[in-house]
Amino acid sequence: MIKVAAAGGGTGGHLYPLLAILETLAKRVDVKVLFFAVKGKIDERVVRKDHPEFETVSIDVRGLLRPLHHPKNLWRTLKIGIATIEVKKHLKRFKPDLVVLTGGYISGVVGLAAKDLGIPIFVHEQNVVPGLAVKVLSQYAKKVFVSFERTRDYLREWQDKIVVTGCPVRETEKEAPLKDFVLVLGGSLGSEAINELMEKVYPELQETQFVHSTGSDDWTERLSVFPNVTALTYIDPMGAYWKKAIASISRAGASTIAEMMYYGVPGILIPWESSAESHQLENALEAERLGYGIVIRENEASPRKIIESIDKVVKKGKIEKMKENPASKISEEILGEIM
């Protein structure tokens, strides 16, 4: 048995790739997991539901605001210090063989605590542009896994540690009850604009079938009036629908792009302009460069442009599915280092 401590939360973009790694590790060896979740965030809820066998510890911590000299950061820094002491207590008790981290402020806290205790650290960065936690932790990590080759440019000092793997995706045996539809993901953070945009598109494309993840019951009711739209408040598991989709419309979060590329679904990407350090724009441009998508800037998105782009991506057809889930390569690398 190996004992793994893990953190990567606050958002689904950090959480789901981490779960993909842990689930793949568990298929290869007997694993006991200590999971550090952010109190009140998605990781706390999802991990307790999907993996009751994990020991889940909720940590009350928030990331630093930008700019870093923001006056509220004084209090947040104090809370980070308190959280680090708490995390160290749990790590000393659990005695993990390694720590797996996928970014977000909770990763910074757990990673620095693990560094002080001499526990091997493995990091994965989902975005093209690495976040602050990954930049800091890369100097202490045994391996730094990245989704894109271009991420090397942002971590020049740690080239010998970097392994380009792609972004892990959670596997599922389930399949959607529909097929040959355009998958619209409008329910995540900052995506109200996609819901509003698609409401104007649907009447113009009545021959095209859509599945739309809305993010709220109100939007589900509102979009269900269109006969060509299957509106769902939340989709779980996402893979069941990616398998059957012929195209997609979404923001450009790393895990969304990872699923799009893994299942070979061409997409229209509308980057969220407010994402940290323009992460979503950089992700979208890289996916477009690799031939997976069309990027439409939010201030340029119109019903007419979406309709024209849907026609292009549907005509493009599905791309060959990835032969191997990046989670497999990451698991092999980790086990090769510690066993």
UniProtKB/Swiss-Prot annotation:
Catalysis: reaction(s): di-trans,octa-cis-undecaprenyl diphospho-N-acetyl-alpha-D-muramoyl-L-alanyl-D-glutamyl-meso-2,6-diaminopimeloyl-D-alanyl-D-alanine + UDP-N-acetyl-alpha-D-glucosamine = di-trans,octa-cis-undecaprenyl diphospho-[N-acetyl-alpha-D-glucosaminyl-(1->4)]-N-acetyl-alpha-D-muramoyl-L-alanyl-D-glutamyl-meso-2,6-diaminopimeloyl-D-alanyl-D-alanine + UDP + H(+)
Catalytic EC class: transferase
GO biological process, one term: cell division
Pathway membership: Cell wall biogenesis; peptidoglycan biosynthesis
Keywords assigned: Cell cycle, Cell division, Cell inner membrane, Cell membrane, Cell shape, Cell wall biogenesis/degradation, Glycosyltransferase, Membrane, Peptidoglycan synthesis, Transferase
Localization of this protein: Cell inner membrane
Database matches in HAMAP family: MurG
Function statement: Cell wall formation. Catalyzes the transfer of a GlcNAc subunit on undecaprenyl-pyrophosphoryl-MurNAc-pentapeptide (lipid intermediate I) to form undecaprenyl-pyrophosphoryl-MurNAc-(pentapeptide)GlcNAc (lipid intermediate II).
Protein name: UDP-N-acetylglucosamine--N-acetylmuramyl-(pentapeptide) pyrophosphoryl-undecaprenol N-acetylglucosamine transferase
Gene field: murG
